[in-house]
From Swiss-Prot:
Origin organism lineage: Bacteria, Bacillati, Actinomycetota, Actinomycetes, Micrococcales
Keyword Metal-binding: yes
Organism: Micrococcus luteus (strain ATCC 4698 / DSM 20030 / JCM 1464 / CCM 169 / CCUG 5858 / IAM 1056 / NBRC 3333 / NCIMB 9278 / NCTC 2665 / VKM Ac-2230)
Name of the protein in its database record: L-cysteine:1D-myo-inositol 2-amino-2-deoxy-alpha-D-glucopyranoside ligase
EC numbers, comma separated: 6.3.1.13
Cofactor note: Binds 1 zinc ion per subunit.
Length: 422
């Protein structure tokens, strides 16, 4: 599947700060990418309908900061993102609107690509649809069945014979993975959110209510692929990310990213499936973004309370202002989108642009030091923007000493923050 195009970031001098990133799984600070010359990143992609709302955009802009930070440090970065281009919510939306599910997925994925390019999100090296990874899924599920890490559920109660589920208990007894080690949730928390996030705890024949689906055998009217010994059907949700990441990244890779609503079950079981197949952890560090609200509630496809990047662009809103509005909030915080947030961001962009014609436009070292230090501290973008405010006001420390520095501020801001002011 094709990705999108974004200009290469300007080159800026490296800095000695070491990245500190919060790891959801342990609750501790990690230093990903500080121990070598390579880093790898997997960010879970969209299910292509209602693209691209501000919750999506906030997540991809956040991990774009990490990508840019590593690249500015001189690391060779491998970045992979998936597209869940076949899944129940997509099929339900297609049926409700009378659109072919493939046409809906293609249209919304194209829209997502355009939005990401407009927001200056650096493109992944591999952009992979779930439908492109079916063969890899079949390989993995057959391996788990043979090892006793998965099982077939009998038919009945209107369900056909042969759906394959992951055996949580067997996996825990035979591998180093333990339920909750990625999500840092207890059983009560997991049980509460599982049915809200695609789980089916009451499915007859399951060995444990939390066992997730690996392979859904064909139902009338649903798309299906050749599953060899599994029978005709389609992948479950979590397994797609397990196999796509394994196909394109080291095992384990450096950082798994996504929204906080993916902690469980998605990231928990993506990690479990990968370990059940080859015995290796999925990732070293798990990082999650906060939720974006609108009108007092989490922005959600199911609720329909969405602000779309494409809608803002159609209104004539500058994408750089949308990106600045997102960066004004720490990536791990929950926050609320509003017109005032956008107005404030546009005003900041206007001030920064005016300062590019002022006496400190070449004071790149002072700005670089401040922005890099902020991003080194758990990608603290709000602090980085405050440094830009201080630069524009002429109050950032070091401006006098570095006023003749050859590093343009405009390059620093574009390279590290993805804000193209010119």
């Amino acid at each position: 599947m094709k990705s999108w195009s974004t200009p290469a970031p300007p080159t800026v001098p490296s800095r000695p700060d070491r990245l500190r990133l919060h790891d959801t799984a342990t609750g501790r600070t990690r230093h990903p990418g500080n121990d070598g010359r390579r880093a790898s990143l997997y960010v879970c992609g969209i299910t292509p309908y209602d693209a691209t709302h501000l919750g999506h955009a906030s997540t991809y802009v956040a991990f774009d900061l990490l990508h840019r930070y590593w690249r500015a440090a001189g690391l060779e970065v491998a970045y992979v993102q998936n597209v869940t281009d076949v899944d129940d919510p997509l099929l339900e939306r297609a049926e409700a609107t009378g659109v072919d599910w493939r046409a809906l997925a293609e249209e919304q994925t194209d829209l997502f690509r355009a939005d990401m390019a407009a927001l200056e999100v650096l493109a992944p090296d591999h952009y992979v649809g779930a439908t492109e990874a079916v063969g890899l899924v079949v390989d993995a599920v057959e391996t788990m069945l043979a090892a006793g890490r998965a099982y077939r559920v009998p038919g009945g109660d209107g369900e056909p014979e042969g759906d394959v589920y992951f055996d949580v208990r067997s996996a825990q007894s035979a591998t180093d993975w333990r339920l909750g080690q990625v999500s840092a949730m207890d059983l009560d928390e997991m049980a509460a959110v599982f049915p809200e996030r695609g789980g089916d705890p009451d499915r007859p024949g399951k060995r444990d209510p939390l066992d997730p689906l690996l392979w859904r055998v064909h139902r009338e009217g649903e798309p299906a692929w050749d599953g060899r010994s599994l029978g005709s059907g389609r992948p479950g949700w979590h397994i797609e990310c397990s196999v796509i990441s394994r196909a394109h990244l080291p095992a384990p890779f450096t950082v798994q990213g996504g929204g906080s609503d993916l902690r469980f079950p998605h990231h928990e079981f993506s990690a479990a499936h990968a370990t059940a197949v080859d015995g290796l952890p999925l990732a070293h560090t798990y990082a999650h973004t906060g939720m974006v609200a609108l009108d007092g509630e989490k922005m959600s496809k199911s609720l329909g309370n969405l602000e779309l990047v494409s809608r803002l662009r159609a209104r004539g809103v500058e994408p750089v202002a949308v990106r600045a509005a997102i960066l004004a909030h720490h990536y791990r915080s929950d926050w609320e989108w509003s017109e005032q947030v956008l107005t404030d961001a546009q005003a900041r962009v206007t001030r920064w642009r005016a300062a590019l014609d002022g006496p400190h436009a070449a004071a790149g070292v002072a700005v670089l030091d401040a922005v890099h230090a902020a991003l080194s501290d758990d990608l603290d973008a709000p602090r980085a923007l405050e440094a830009l405010d201080a630069w524009a006001a002429g109050t950032l420390p070091g401006l006098v000493e570095t006023a003749a520095d050859p590093v343009p501020v405009v390059d620093v801001v574009a390279a590290l923050l993805g804000l193209r002011l010119r």
